[in-house]
Amino acid sequence: MEFNRSITLRALALITAFFISHTALGTPLIKPFLGHYTGSTVVEESGVELNRDLDVTISETDEGFNVFWKSTTVKADGRIKTKDFDISFTPTDREHVFQAAQRPSLFGGTKPLDPMKGEPYVWARIVGDTLTIFALLILDDGGYELQIYNRSLSDSGLNLEYSRIRDGEQLRTIKSTLTKD
């Protein structure tokens, strides 16, 4: 009985140490990116050039980091279209790779969404001065769409390069410089 209790306590200590060190892996990599950034770009929709305002906030969480981003476009007819995303990321066993923590898991943690249900599979990586977020969608016909957000550190804030690819075809590219507030 005492032997089993000792093993249980050691296992709990080992699991706790793993989660503490596992969580700490990602924290230093995100520090240079932390902050609030704003900017704008011009996008073309149906042959019309439209201004798009961009807003990004990168913050630390207890488990990793969070990225909130919003784009606001004034359409030619005056309507305002806003899209926003708010995704937390946690470290993985790979030093520079982070999984999205978008849905509660069975054991109280969080997990990515399910791409087989039409939900985006999202992950991030940090390589050098670039934070990249990937969003993979599996389409109804079995094809795919991949959205890539490269956010590279610059003297004034972040350089954003966005790409949207469907079944190997480049559908959209957006570039902008975002200023850190």
Tell where the protein language model's regions lie, with residue ranges.
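Central antiparallel beta-sheet cores of small beta-barrel/beta-sandwich binding domains
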Residues: S40-L139, Y144-L146, E169, T179-D181
